């Protein structure tokens, strides 16, 4: 039997997280928050919590897309930025990741080392996550903001993130909330249903799916982790 996780009180959770974010920003003597909006539920909730904590004028949303980013995700990132009414920019990371491939001469290297395609795919996917982290910190430095992480408890517990990529941040406000609990909170906090219900994916390569990679649905995973 799959265990259903207890529902979190959305009002109490919001107050607690808002206090945590405000204290962290104030301790850092920072002026605001940069959030990478991917168009998914985790970053949408993180953006919402940032705005609730600091006001929309102190939050910058950035969507960093590549050729493998699903069009729907770009649409949802824009939708979220509009709903939150925050400053928002879109940056393509394709040129930067292509430059990396040229510099590392990946094609010749593969013939030398016999690296299989899957390994290359994962290395390139992780590279994209790390490029995104670098861009978030670049904008954070320019504005004296901190970078908000978007990792949930389910992913953090099993290590389903890129070290120094999406794992590179100053604060993880949803890091204590399991994915299935987050879906219910997102509903209460007014995150659009389209964003909540679409299959979770990182868009690091074509047709990527979180649950395929993990090998379990988040319902099963959370029931095991909890």
Name what the model sees in each region.
Residues 82, 119-132, 146-217:
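Catalytic subdomain that performs nucleotidyl-dependent activation
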Residues 1-157:
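ATP-dependent adenylation/nucleotidyltransferase module used to activate substrates
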């Amino acid at each position: 039997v799959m265990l259903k996780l207890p529902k979190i009180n959305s009002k109490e959770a919001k107050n607690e997280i808002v206090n945590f974010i405000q204290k962290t920003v104030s301790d850092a003597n920072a002026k605001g928050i940069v959030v990478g909006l991917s168009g998914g539920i985790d970053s949408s909730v993180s953006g919402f919590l940032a705005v609730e904590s600091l006001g929309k004028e102190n939050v910058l949303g950035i969507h960093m897309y590549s050729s493998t980013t699903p069009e729907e995700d770009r649409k949802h990132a824009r939708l979220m930025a509009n709903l939150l009414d925050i400053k928002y920019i879109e940056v393509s990371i394709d040129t930067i990741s292509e430059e990396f491939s040229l510099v590392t001469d990946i094609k010749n290297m593969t013939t030398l080392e016999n690296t299989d395609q899957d390994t290359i795919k994962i290395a390139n996917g992780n590279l994209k996550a790390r490029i995104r982290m670098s861009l978030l910190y670049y904008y954070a430095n320019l504005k004296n903001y901190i970078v908000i992480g978007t990792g949930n408890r389910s992913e953090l517990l099993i290590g389903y993130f890129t070290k120094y990529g999406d794992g590179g941040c100053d604060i993880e406000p949803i890091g204590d909330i399991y994915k299935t609990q987050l879906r219910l909170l997102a509903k209460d906090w007014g995150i659009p249903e389209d964003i909540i219900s679409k299959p979770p994916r990182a868009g690091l390569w074509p047709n990527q799916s979180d649950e395929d990679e993990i090998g379990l649905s988040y319902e099963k995973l959370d029931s095991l982790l909890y």
